[in-house]
């Protein structure tokens, strides 16, 4: 049996992986897939890839493009979620903010530098017409850290996936002022180059297997109830999320890659332009 290490966020997007593991789908192909949840998100997962502490990661597109641009020895091996991610823009419920425009020149909570919450703060600032050089950040590690930072006033707002934070909005911990969708497919599968060079056939089996699961995922009977129970979400929220989410079984296109890279260049988040073939496997 070939052991493969994989990391991802503990969110509903990744249920297909857990179902495939639980049902022995990878083991049927001679693969033991060792999944680790990373609640800190993309910045932490990029570091794990760079340090050879994981073989694969289910990671935000913009985050891994930035990380590879900065020398991370990894490659994008496939799209995973082809639809955009809906980033909610949240404040503590007791704060005075009423609109996103009021957040100009305030401090954003981010899980870490290079994370989705960090990069999307720039995308949102550009969308709002703010001076991105004046953005301020407070590193909070994870969602629990964001709750504490916003409550104590060490940060003013926090961007995180809309439906993951919905229970905190419903319970009155956060207020959502708006949403900012990513302008590209949100999640990709990335592989450490050391693993990739030695295990191309193993990787192909992993991709074939997960693609079967994601292709059929929405047609699984009562999958909405399974998701709602497993991730402690309201059924109507899961139904809305499922209607907005499309899993992908294809490689990231050069056009999409260039769009992500150009946005990062325009925001001065990467310094140099890289070739598609240097970053995307195929």
Which residues make up each language-model segment?
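Short, glycine-/small- and polar/acidic-enriched structural segments
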Residues: 2-130, 156-162, 174-177, 181
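Proline/Glycine/Serine-rich low-complexity intrinsically disordered segments
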Residues: 94-99, 126, 132, 193, ...
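Glycine/proline-rich, positively charged
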Residues: 112, 134-136, 141
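Pocket-lining segment of extracytoplasmic ligand-binding domains
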Residues: 138, 144-227
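Secondary-structure end/capping motifs
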Residues: 197-271
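Hinge/cleft segment of the Venus flytrap/periplasmic-binding protein
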Residues: 273-282
């Amino acid at each position: 049996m070939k052991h493969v290490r994989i990391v991802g966020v503990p969110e509903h997007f990744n249920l297909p992986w857990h179902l495939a593991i639980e049902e022995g789908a990878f083991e049927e192909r001679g693969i033991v897939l060792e999944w680790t949840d990373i609640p800190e998100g993309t910045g932490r997962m990029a570091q794990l890839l760079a340090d050879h502490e994981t073989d694969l990661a289910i990671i935000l597109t913009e985050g891994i493009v930035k990380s590879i641009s900065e020398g991370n020895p990894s490659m994008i091996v496939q799209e995973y979620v082809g639809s955009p991610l809906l980033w909610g823009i949240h404040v503590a419920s007791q704060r005075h903010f009423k609109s996103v425009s009021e957040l100009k020149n305030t401090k954003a909570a981010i899980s870490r530098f290079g994370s989705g919450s960090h990069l999307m703060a720039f995308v949102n600032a550009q969308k709002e017409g703010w001076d991105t050089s004046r953005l301020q950040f407070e590193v909070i590690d994870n969602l629990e850290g964001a709750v504490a930072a916003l409550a104590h006033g060490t940060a003013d707002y926090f961007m995180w996936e809309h439906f993951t934070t919905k229970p905190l909005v419903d319970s009155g911990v956060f207020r959502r002022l708006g949403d900012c969708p990513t302008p590209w497919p949100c999640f990709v599968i990335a592989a450490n180059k050391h693993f990739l060079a030695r295990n191309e056939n193993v990787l192909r089996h992993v991709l074939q297997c997960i693609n079967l699961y994601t292709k059929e995922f929405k047609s699984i009977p009562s999958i909405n109830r399974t998701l709602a129970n497993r991730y402690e979400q309201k059924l109507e929220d899961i139904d809305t999320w499922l209607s907005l989410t499309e899993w992908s079984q294809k490689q990231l296109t050069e056009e999409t890659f260039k769009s992500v890279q150009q946005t990062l260049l325009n925001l001065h988040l990467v310094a140099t332009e890289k070739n598609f073939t240097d970053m995307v496997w195929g």
